[in-house]
Amino acid sequence: HSQGTFTSDYSKYLDSRRAQDFVQWLMNSKRSGGISXXHADGTFTSDMSSYLEEKAAKEFVDWLIKGRPKHADGSFTSDFNKALDIKAAQEFLDWIINTPVKE
């Protein structure tokens, strides 16, 4: 039960972090004039999709590079890694499924 609570809390943290990153991206785009001009012609959605695709790809590559940490607390680390593996796989598959094919 505590593992599920931890996983849920961690998932909420990741969602919060993504939201913070997105807000920061919006603020940076607004300062550079990217959003106000692009919103009317529909490119805002495309810009957001590109941002999210790049972010998902970067997070997945970072996850692959870091690999599995080794700790003395093997059981907790193992369970935590399994939860992260599942979450990363789900996010990667969602990204692949939801990415429009560019011609």
Curated annotation (Swiss-Prot):
Signal peptide: none
Chain segments annotated as transmembrane: none
Example GO biological process: protein kinase A signaling
Induction statement: Produced in the A cells of the islets of Langerhans in response to a drop in blood sugar concentration.
Classification via InterPro entries: Glucagon, Glucagon_GIP_secretin_VIP
Any Pfam family: Hormone_2
Subcellular location as annotated: Secreted
Any one GO molecular-function label of the UniProt entry: hormone activity
Keywords tagged on the record: Hormone, Secreted
Primary subcellular site in the record, as a coarse category: secreted
GO CC annotation: extracellular space
Family of this protein: Belongs to the glucagon family.
Miscellaneous comment text of the record: X's in the sequence were included by homology with other species sequences.
Protein name (Swiss-Prot/TrEMBL): Pro-glucagon
Source organism (scientific name): Aquarana catesbeiana (American bullfrog)
Gene: gcg
